Amino acid sequence: MLPTVFIVSDGTGITAETFAHSILSQFDQKFRLVRVPFIDSIEKAYGTVQKIDDAAQHDGRRPIVFTTLVDGESNEIVKRSNALVLDMFQRFVEPLEQELQLKSSHAMGRVHQNADTEEYKTRIEAINFSLAHDDGQSNRNLADADVILIGVSRSGKTPTSLYLAMQYGVKAANYPLIPEDFERGKLPTPLHPHRDKLFGLSIDPMRLSEIRNERRPGSKYAAPENCRYEINEAEAMMRREGVKWLSSTHKSIEEIATTILQEIKLERQSY
């Protein structure tokens, strides 16, 4: 039976879950994840304890609990559960209070209270921009892009563009490199004025073939030899044109996005 891990938060739980994934990925073990967001009352805290204790009894072992509860009373209630409770708020905030000689606000969900802020507006604009400029469907306003991702079809351009927009407010367009471009030996014409904004994504040809076969099984588009040809030509073109690029094969979207931000010297706040 897989160990049970609870993600307990008074907000969405995104912060706690991100931290939990980072820690748990260090262990060669699968886990059963249980998300318990919006614990913003004493009653909900007691209800959470019941869920945790029930899991302990069912599993025959203590669950692991990652918590970012700000309210002290709710936090103490959860800590009384039959579990290993890892309190990220107390672990980091209290030493900072001592070091800075300041009291934190202890405001629940403060990191996500951005619905009326300029940052929120920036993020929405970036998402709309990325959707409008997905897969080269529009050449309008490409000059407004923070970055333009290029690569062969199914190399990870679309999810990376949307992640950059949603997480960092980056206006990320993406443009496909197709066989006609390789025959001409040149970048697509609409990209010529924006070479300084280009960043390429490549991928292992066999992995690309697997992905394409899910979409169009048995087609030339998905054939291993065609995928090898397209990847070789795309990488050669990017080297020739001086475009920075990376392979997305063994990287998460988070890793790809962080690398892109570093390479193109973009400084953005994570939302």
Curated annotation (Swiss-Prot):
* Listed EC numbers: 2.7.11.33, 2.7.4.28
Presence of the UniProt keyword Glycoprotein in the record: no
A Gene Ontology molecular function term for this protein is: phosphotransferase activity, phosphate group as acceptor
Pfam families named in the record: Kinase-PPPase (PF03618)
* Catalytic activity, reaction form: [pyruvate, water dikinase] + ADP = [pyruvate, water dikinase]-phosphate + AMP + H(+); [pyruvate, water dikinase]-phosphate + phosphate + H(+) = [pyruvate, water dikinase] + diphosphate
Its keywords, alphabetically, are: Kinase, Nucleotide-binding, Serine/threonine-protein kinase, Transferase
Listed InterPro entries: Kinase-pyrophosphorylase (IPR005177), PSRP (IPR026530)
Q: Does the keyword Kinase apply?
A: yes
Detail which positions bind ADP: G151, V152, S153, R154, S155, G156, K157, T158
* EC top class, as a word: transferase
Q: Which family does it belong to?
A: Belongs to the pyruvate, phosphate/water dikinase regulatory protein family. PSRP subfamily.
Q: What is its biological role?
A: Bifunctional serine/threonine kinase and phosphorylase involved in the regulation of the phosphoenolpyruvate synthase (PEPS) by catalyzing its phosphorylation/dephosphorylation.
Protein name as annotated: Putative phosphoenolpyruvate synthase regulatory protein
Taxonomic path:
Bacteria, Pseudomonadati, Pseudomonadota, Betaproteobacteria, Burkholderiales
